[in-house]
Structures are given as structure tokens and as C-alpha cells.
């Protein structure tokens, strides 16, 4: 599966950035429950692993909350490759909003 890596810089303390990312994941589980069949995440310090399925697609990846940026690494199913730039910009926009 093709991969996608998105970096977004932030000016927050690392713990606050982590809190915001984790809260956004919890919110997404509820807000998008009609589109997401399953969203699982597990955290070890400042690194989170996730698996998601919905709308006929499955994906997985990692989120790293670093002192000055957040990095999302994920796989994209071949069937969704046409939407790679849209997925990337959606992740970037969401992270930018969360970390503002």
C-alpha cells in the first residue's frame, strides 16, 4: 500500500499538543460514526498507533507528537490512491486547526 506522511509545525508545549490530538481522535470517533466503522488508537508516550475502517476502506498509521511538530504516517489503500492529495490536505488542515 502507498504511504503518506504529513508534518505540521506547532508552537504548543508537547503535552498540550498531545492532549489536543487525543481529544480530536476521541471527537472524530463520535462525530464521524456514520462514516467510520472502526477507529482504534493506542498511545505510548507521544506516539500513537491507529487503525481505521469505513466506507469500504481500511487504513493504519502512526502519529508522533514532537516538541515542534506533529507527524502523521499512514497507508492508503490502492483503491483510494486517486484521493491521496485530498486525504493529505484534509489531514494537514485538521492538524493545523487542532494545533492553532
What is the predicted function of each stretch?
Residues 48-54:
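Short beta-strand segments that buttress and anchor functional surface loops
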Residues 55-58, 87-89:
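Amphipathic hydrophobic-ligand
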Residues 41-43, 65:
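Generic beta-strand structural signal
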Residues 65-97:
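C-terminal structural segments of small proteins and small subunits
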Residues 54, 97-98:
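Eukaryotic endomembrane contact-site and trafficking scaffolds
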Residues 46-48, 70:
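Hydrophobic residues embedded in beta-strands of well-ordered beta-sheets
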Residues 59-64:
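Hydrophobic/aromatic beta-strand elements that line small-molecule binding cavities or substrate pockets
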Residues 1-20, 24-39:
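Terminal, regulation- and interaction-focused segments at domain boundaries
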Amino acid at each position: 500500500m502507498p504511504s503518506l506522511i504529513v508534518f505540521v509545525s506547532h508552537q504548543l508545549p508537547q503535552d498540550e499538543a498531545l492532549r489536543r490530538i487525543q481529544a480530536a481522535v476521541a471527537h472524530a470517533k463520535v462525530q464521524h460514526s456514520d462514516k467510520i466503522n472502526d477507529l482504534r488508537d493506542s498511545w505510548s508516550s507521544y506516539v500513537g498507533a491507529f487503525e481505521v475502517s469505513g466506507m469500504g476502506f481500511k487504513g493504519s498509521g502512526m502519529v508522533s507528537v514532537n516538541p515542534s511538530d506533529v507527524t502523521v504516517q499512514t497507508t492508503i489503500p490502492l483503491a483510494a490512491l486517486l484521493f491521496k492529495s485530498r486525504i493529505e490536505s484534509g489531514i494537514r488542515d485538521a492538524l493545523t486547526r487542532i494545533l492553532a
